[in-house]
Amino acid sequence: MHIPVLLKETIELLNPQPNQHFVDGTLGEGGHSLAILERTSPDGKVLGIDLNEETLKIANTKIQSSNFKTDKLTTDRLILAQGNFSNIKGITRTNEFITIHGILLDLGLSSRIL
């Protein structure tokens, strides 16, 4: 899996705790979301948003097939939404993602897109 630049620093600043919920507004290949899911076990959730449908599929496959050390990762912990983070309010409402402990936007360019 692609490891995002400044992953450690980003996770330290977000400081995800067990059972918290986060929005990853620029899911990409899911590296940040995977790290958040690891730290929010057992019942924390991530709403991952990406404009590119193919990227959502890649992230979902990588996260679901990862072997990180947690007691469970089911589809109810990772919620995927195709869209632009500029519509975050509508996307969170549509997905009934009400309680949010943090929001991540990685605004760099993906080497896959270049």
Task: Please tell me what each predicted stretch does.
Residues 3-20, 35:
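Conserved alpha-helix/loop element of class I SAM-dependent methyltransferases that forms part
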Residues 17-20, 86-105:
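A short acidic, Gly/Pro-enriched loop at the edge of an enzyme's catalytic core
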Residues 59-60:
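Conserved SAM-binding loop
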Residues 68-87:
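Conserved SAM-binding strand-loop segment of SAM-dependent methyltransferases
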